[in-house]
Amino acid sequence: EARGVIILEVANEVNNVEQDSLVEILSIKSPTLDKIIEQMLTNDDNVTAEMILKEIGFSRTGQGSTGSGLVSLPEILAANDLPNTGLLLIDGSGLSRDNQATCGLFQEILEDSEYGTTIEKALPLVGVEGVVSDVFLGTPFESNLVAHTFFDTDRGALVGSYTTSEGIEVLIT
């Protein structure tokens, strides 16, 4: 009611209702996972990253928690022959300063025939969109590099793909 919504009656709890007797009043179709990942990487959306990790945990253990996702992720990497040596994850958002991953892992993910293309297509274009819209302006990377970056006072990272003036694609980790 504080926002102009007037509630005329109190809701009633109803149990043991037959599914056939229910009437759908609203349906919202979720974007596909590749679009969710694109939004996450373009906007540096840490909440979405954390929620994806929890969903991974739920799909593998039945528990939608950060902990179950953290246990599941190295198993998924190993099952796909991706290296998880040197991988230490504390959260799914990527905000913990204790998270660790190797360049080799990111390189192999980008090179992976099943996942690499999806990730590469989801990365924002440097100098144009999202979290990288204001980096590398006036350089050959502007509009030729799709990347996700992280920069802090004492460290940084960049993962992406650069197309040279000769049309050669170079993966950068």
Residue locations for each model-derived region?
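A small/polar active-site loop signature that marks catalytic segments
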Residues: 1-117
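C-terminal soluble interaction/assembly domains
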Residues: 72, 85-173
